[in-house]
């Protein structure tokens, strides 16, 4: 029997369990709703961004019901990553029937404990999340780490998919040569995921969003610096995440993250917000300790912040992460996909001189498109003129990592995007500048390139040879 199995057998003497939520100095305590956690002898934060195993010694989902913790399902060698359906009746999870199996996606009906396999592939499929309109998404292990994919969830659709060109069937949502791992589905229908920054190149964890058809990828905020991961959206619309040793949030009025004054601890990320606004979260005292489920009331909610974290569930020698409340929740908006049935995409830049890193002083004369093939080799696909106001309009390859390079009149590099992004087949995208940040709006004017022509410069059939200058010029 492995360490996890032994720990769960002795669960009655190894558990610290506080079955109440709404903890305060008053007597009006509320019973905590049932919740699910992933229990593992070892949880390795951020292993997913290296394409590695987060639970190298196995894991098991526990259901905490009326103050008692027990395995959520039977007959599995390993289970993890619970996501409760919007009506609170079903649970998606990653599971292995035998230890040698890859992770696959399963669904549990809570009322009768019926389990069915939802997704089966040759490799690991992890972190499933429900999407509206009868679909789900997950992280698929690939040669480049994890990539996000989506598919029908197997239920009779209550609503048709809003654009047939984006489904049905299995649909890849990310197209970059680096791990992308989902963390939440936002209220507006976008998918929140973590990857490294710069995207496709860097090593600093960052939070990004993408629509349910794989279009519109962007970083959530552009105040890049410290690593942040484990993002979850609250009922208020704020997104809470962890730096590891601290918590912070993205809130609508601010273009940069807002620190959260939380008790000193290491936070795993992925909180669960109760109806009263309190948080169930996974935290530990330090690197040598194990994660436990704690309860905390942040100071910016209706209840005053607690002086310390209250332990709700702890198991000796076991990490407890990913709390998920078993309760109905608001269904996110469906994304009305605007993709066309094309094998290319159009991109309009309003002012390529603008950047979050500082505007380009020397006016760019042209822009070069670079694309990364399946082997990671960079090829230059051609150039397009940049207008005096910084605008350009191009037709680009779709569903592949791309980036732009600004050139002066002599063809020398003024600035190259540090990372990569993709644009979906049939997508028509407008950018304010080059990595300006979602908080920056465009000037109220017609871009000069559209006054000259409404035909995009075709950069889809450029040179296929590797770009010899890319390595020498640096990123």
Task: For the regions a language model picked out, list residue spans one by one.
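Multi-bladed beta-propeller domains
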Residues: 65-78, 109-124, 161-178, 211-227, ...
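C-type cytochrome heme c attachment motif
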Residues: 106, 137-138, 161, 190-194, ...
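Structural motif
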Residues: 58-60, 100-106, 146-161, 201-208, ...
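Asp-box/WD-like beta-propeller blade repeats and closely related beta-sheet repeat scaffolds
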Residues: 102-104, 114-161, 169-179
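Residue position within the beta-strands of beta-propeller blades
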Residues: 35-46, 90-94, 136-141, 191-195, ...
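Conserved beta-propeller blade repeats
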Residues: 76-86, 90, 122-135, 177-194, ...
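Sequence context surrounding c-type heme c attachment/ligation sites in exported
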Residues: 316-319, 388-475
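Short, acidic Ser/Thr/Gly-rich low-complexity loop/linker segments typical of extracellular
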Residues: 70-74, 376-389
